[in-house]
């Protein structure tokens, strides 16, 4: 088959699902990602703790949060670019998950991230996906990232999937 089920989603058995480098993803579907970011930021209330998954859509959420941060906001992320974007924003308490940096993708992965995520609770998590299949669910080309996404969801009281239209139908070839 094209996919192999894992805890929290599915991963590709072959090369159909290949992770696009972060720098390229940030320039794809920009208008959709900006609209998604606006809707996401509107959900965040002052004093909340928010988890931002690693990815280009969540990066757009971070850039918008930087320009209009709610009072008392705490952001947790495994994304190096989001950490850098929010690092000089004094009104946001910023927490990085630690872990091993995935080259070209700038996501922190590994057992350090998983251990950390098991110890926290947040009001909201904004989760991206490489692909979505209506039967299988969220898909990732990387089993470690699939596991981390499941832990991100478990750590939050409210989970919001933030994906643009390009994520649908990738695994159906």
Regions found by a protein language model. Give the residues of each.
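Conserved phosphate- and dinucleotide-binding cores of soluble alpha/beta proteins
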Residues: 5, 80-173
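Short beta-strand element of Class I
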Residues: 72-76, 94
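Gly/Ser/Thr-rich loops at beta-strand to alpha-helix junctions
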Residues: 50, 56-59
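Short, well-ordered coil/turn residues at beta-beta hairpins
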Residues: 53-54, 128
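HTH-adjacent hinge/linker in prokaryotic transcriptional regulators
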Residues: 1-51, 63-70, 87-91
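Short, well-ordered alpha-helical scaffold segments within catalytic/effector domains
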Residues: 33-41, 58-59, 114, 146
